């Protein structure tokens, strides 16, 4: 029996999707059915299980609303968990908005969770800590709203980012390259910038003026010319991360430009090539060559736009309900 990662492209939502794996090239077709037929769910971003044993989930919408989906949808109605103002987050209705939500590993004892979203005036992305004061009712503490990170965003696209906790208890955050096309400011390879990276921080501690601490084993902590938060460089628009906790493997779906969509295995200190490369091939529109000290990590899987569109994310499936996924 093989355990296979499942990755889904945007076109998957039309009627059915192919399961593309790094372990093999075969495609398994399964059907998709509507789960929330009577609920307005514009631009769903993610589905997050509430880690309290209740069976409830949160449906995160890019426009700023988070819905509570009960375990028994026949007996209980969907309700609102929180709602952010779209006017404060979004100027151009494309990639801006509420992009990620993750619960703290010790949520049952501290009630904490984290949002990643854009803000305007000035244009920026923020990682914010919030708290649930009544876990049974999923009621928010209105007085707990702590901003940990603010990242200036030059444009309205490539704002991608999703926070995920690793098995080490640290928070990993993917960030886009700042937008437009061709990475015009070379942020992805700029080690002073937090754009075009995967970051790793300790949200349970503070350090100096920071609202978080930088783990001692981060690859660039204390290295001149580098931000210590950086875990990897060379990302374009890493829309989703997924931790396969049993194998302690971090997967990343990095959206391409014109040539390739990438699935990457995230490694400590790795450089994934953008904008010198797109996928395993040279990115010729920049008309430049990397110097000899650059070492790039190839994606474990890539596909061209003749096969599909934007890679949107995925999971490693370890269940037994759908044996065709093995």
PLM ranges: what are they?
Residues 5-18:
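Bacterial N-terminal signal peptides
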Residues 5-8, 151, 224, 303-304:
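Generic hydrophobic-segment detector
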Residues 23-182, 240-256, 307-326:
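Acidic, Gly/Ser/Thr-rich repeat motifs that build Ca2+-stabilized beta-propeller blades
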Residues 1-2:
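N-terminal secretory signal peptides that target proteins for export/translocation
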Residues 52, 60-63, 96-98, 106, ...:
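Beta-propeller domain segments
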């Amino acid at each position: 029996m093989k355990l296979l990662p499942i990755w889904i492209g945007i076109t998957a939502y039309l009627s059915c999707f192919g399961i593309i794996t790094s372990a093999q090239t075969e495609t398994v077709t399964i059907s998709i059915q509507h789960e929330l037929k009577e609920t307005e769910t514009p631009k769903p971003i993610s589905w997050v299980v509430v880690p309290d044993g209740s069976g409830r989930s949160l449906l995160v919408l890019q426009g700023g609303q988070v819905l509570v989906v009960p375990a028994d949808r026949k007996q209980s109605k969907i309700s609102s968990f929180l709602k952010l103002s779209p006017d404060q987050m979004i100027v151009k209705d494309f990639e801006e908005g509420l992009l990620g939500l993750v619960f703290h590993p010790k949520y049952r004892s501290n009630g904490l969770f984290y949002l990643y979203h854009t803000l305007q005036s000035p244009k920026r992305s923020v990682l914010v800590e919030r708290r649930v004061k009544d876990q049974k009712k999923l009621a928010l503490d209105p007085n707990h709203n702590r901003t940990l990170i603010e990242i200036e965003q030059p444009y309205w696209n490539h704002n991608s980012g999703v926070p995920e906790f690793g098995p080490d208890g640290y928070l990993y955050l993917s960030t886009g390259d700042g937008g437009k096309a061709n990475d015009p400011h070379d942020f992805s390879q700029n080690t002073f910038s937090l754009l075009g990276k995967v970051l790793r921080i300790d949200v349970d501690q503070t350090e100096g003026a920071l609202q978080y601490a930088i783990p001692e084993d981060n690859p660039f902590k204390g290295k001149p010319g580098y931000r210590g938060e950086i875990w990897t460089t060379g990302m374009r628009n890493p829309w989703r991360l997924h931790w396969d906790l049993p194998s302690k493997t971090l997967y990343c779906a990095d959206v391409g430009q014109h040539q390739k969509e990438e699935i990457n295995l995230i490694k400590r200190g790795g450089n994934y090539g953008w904008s010198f490369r797109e996928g395993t091939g040279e990115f010729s529109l920049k008309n430049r060559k990397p110097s000899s000290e650059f070492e790039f990590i190839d994606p474990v899987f890539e596909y061209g736009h003749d096969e599909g569109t934007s890679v949107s994310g995925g999971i490693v499936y370890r269940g037994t309900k759908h044996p065709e996924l093995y």
